[in-house]
Every structure is written in C-alpha cells, then in structure tokens.
C-alpha cells in the first residue's frame, strides 16, 4: 500500500510517498526514510528508491520517500537548498513517519549527497537507529583527492564523446549544449550550489559522524573514481570514532549503479542488512 503525503517544514509543503504493508501485524518497528542526492528527487537514481521501498514493503518495512525543499514537487526555492536545509527536512521526515505510522525507530537511506544529509541528521534525533549510505562523499576530511578523481572522470567521459561521429554532427547542426558541458567541466561534475553553503561549512561533521552510535552500512561502486579515497577515509574515520565499518563494494559498478544487476545488488544488500538491524534488540544510538 502506498499513498502520497505532505509534511510542512519552515512554511513549505513537502511531497512524500509512504509505503506500508497492508497487514499491520507484519510491519516491522523500523521505518526507512530515503534521502535523495543533490540534483535528484524522491524516486532516487533510476527509480532505485521507488523499487527498494516497494520491495521493502513486502518484507514488513514502512518507507517514506520525499522531495527536499526546492526539489521535485516540494515547495521552496531551488537556489536556497543547502545541506543544512536538507538535514532539517530529513529530521522533519523522521518525525512525520514516526507520528503517522506504528514505527518506533528510523533508518536513513542516503544516496550521494543524501548520505551527507544522513550523517548530519543522525545524532540529532534519538529514534534514528541506522544508516545506509550509497556512494557517500567524504565528510569531516579533505575531499581534494576524490574531487580530483571525479573531475578526471568527467573529463575522460567528455573526451571519449569528442571521438564520436554523432558529437561532431550535433556540433555542426548547433545541437550541442556547449554552455552546459563547460559548466559541468568547470564544476568537476558538481551541480550548482553543491560546493557548499557557509551554513554547511559551519557544521562540525566529525561530531555529527561520531555522535551517531548506531550501525552504518557503506555501499560503493567498484568502478566509481571516488571510491578508493572514500573507503580509506571512512575506514580511518570509523576507527577514530570507535565505530564498526560495515562495507559492501559492488564490483564493476559506477557511482550511480547504472545496471539492473548492480541496482539489485545494492537493494538486496541494503534490505538484508536492514532486516538484521530491525530484528536486533540492540538500541540504535545513545546520544543526541
């Protein structure tokens, strides 16, 4: 059973979709809240959030997918969206799903920038019990290495396109969006505003990361140019914070897991891990 819902945050109305098992007796106490990436919306990359929420429903999970302010069908100015506002929205979504369903705890499922949001929101609510982070960028550390790897990957991709006949045909016909291409190259693959707002830079990211005491699962694509740097960073960060480093690497996969086999592996791995957390009697975390 899935239905649309609306939640209010800072005077803006956010659109969401709730998924619940028809039989209330089969519902697990752990609800899933999905946090899309910077340029995404509630369906996730190539509808992975929608697919996972529907699959999760058959396993007893309640899910909430929603659009952040300024994204998708939610109200709010696109240019005013920051990681800080996205964290506020994630906390409001957590409150909403707890109030409107029988769930008693929440797991945050973040994709790319949504993983940063999950990390930022984690210790801010006592009923956030677990996190699943897909292709999480580096927080609480130097991103220069992974940003450079991403920029090189973007340049390589456009370099390969230059060798294609259809690219030159588009250029001759005036159908090539050169302004957009230059914008992407200059930004190193980052969208407008993704470099970070002053309010985002003011967040103590290590405190947010280490302050969350629940389990985390990191999932990366083996062929994502940022993976090596991220794995080294988060292994060290987890060790420094005294936390377990649960990791799954999808061999051959890119940043967004663009194949049916890769996305199935991500979804199945996430749900298997989440079900183990839902059936565990261990508390989620201890600090705000």
Which stretches of residues belong to each language-model region?
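N-terminal cap/lid segment of alpha/beta-hydrolase-fold proteins
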Residues: 1-30, 259
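Serine-hydrolase catalytic core
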Residues: 6-9, 52, 151, 155-282
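Short, surface-exposed "cap/lid" segments of acyl-processing enzymes
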Residues: 22-67
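Alpha/beta-hydrolase active-site loop signature
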Residues: 39, 68-72, 138, 254
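Conserved catalytic-core motifs of eukaryotic protein kinase domains, centered on the activation segment
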Residues: 44-46, 74-78, 229
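Catalytic nucleophile-loop/oxyanion-hole region of alpha/beta-hydrolase
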Residues: 71-105
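Primarily recognizes the serine-hydrolase "nucleophile elbow" in alpha/beta-hydrolase
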Residues: 92-160, 209
């Amino acid at each position: 059973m899935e239905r649309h819902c609306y939640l209010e945050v800072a005077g803006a109305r956010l659109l969401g979709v709730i998924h619940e098992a028809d039989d209330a007796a089969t519902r697990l106490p752990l609800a899933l809240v999905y946090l899309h990436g910077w340029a995404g919306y509630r369906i996730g990359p190539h509808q992975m959030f929608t697919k996972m929420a529907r699959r999760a429903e058959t396993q007893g999970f309640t899910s909430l997918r929603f659009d952040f302010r300024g994204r998708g069908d939610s109200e709010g100015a696109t240019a005013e969206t920051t990681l800080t506002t996205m964290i506020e929205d994630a906390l409001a979504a957590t409150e909403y799903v707890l109030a409107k369903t029988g769930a008693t705890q929440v797991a945050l499922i973040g994709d790319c920038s949504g993983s940063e949001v999950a990390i930022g929101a984690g210790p801010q609510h006592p009923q956030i019990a677990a996190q699943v982070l897909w292709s999480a960028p580096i927080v609480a550390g130097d991103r220069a290495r992974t940003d450079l790897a991403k920029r090189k990957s973007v340049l390589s991709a456009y370099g390969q396109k230059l060798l294609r006949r259809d690219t030159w045909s588009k250029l001759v016909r005036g159908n090539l969006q050169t302004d957009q291409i230059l914008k992407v190259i200059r930004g190193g693959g980052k969208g407008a505003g993704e470099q970070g707002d002053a309010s985002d830079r003011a967040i103590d990211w290590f405190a947010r990361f280490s302050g969350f005491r629940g389990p985390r699962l990191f999932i990366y694509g083996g062929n994502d140019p940022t993976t090596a740097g991220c794995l080294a960073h988060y292994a060290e960060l987890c060790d420094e914070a005294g936390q377990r480093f649960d990791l799954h690497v999808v061999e051959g996969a890119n940043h967004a897991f663009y194949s049916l086999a890769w996305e199935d592996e991500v979804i199945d791995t996430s749900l298997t891990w989440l079900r183990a957390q839902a059936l565990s009697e261990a508390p989620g975390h201890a600090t705000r």
